[in-house]
């Protein structure tokens, strides 16, 4: 194993994470309509969800929104304003890792999740690690 790659394995998550300020998030009080609009605009398949204190509480996916639309039986956006993201939130989907987590733990999580939410000791979202950011860092270490 090359010296540069060993450095990647010892890397701090903060170096490869996309900071919260650059991350698309929803708040659990956002309406389903707002969530659908964000998904349509950003073309993501899953988005982290925060509470009022900016703590990470889970993630929602396109499928969560589709299941909700089927359950309510309407695609009327005015009607979807009656429901909040909290109603469809999956708290166990995309579990977060601590900013202190080891690099190999991040790699393992990225094999199961499209993105890995990164939180501080208060469970406040610091940012996310995507598969793309992870691969880019590994590729850069090979140069």
Annotated model-derived regions:
Residues 25-43, 50, 95-113, 119-122, ...:
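The conserved cystathionine-beta-synthase
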Residues 10-23, 81-93:
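Bateman (tandem CBS) regulatory domains
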Residues 11, 30, 60, 83, ...:
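Short beta-to-alpha loop/turn elements within the nucleotide-binding domains of ABC transporters
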Residues 64-80, 134-143:
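A short, polar/charged loop-to-alpha-helix boundary motif
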Residues 39-42, 47-64, 110, 118-133:
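A glycine-centered beta-loop-beta connector
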Residues 1-8:
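Short, low-complexity N-terminal regulatory "tails/caps" that precede and couple sensory modules
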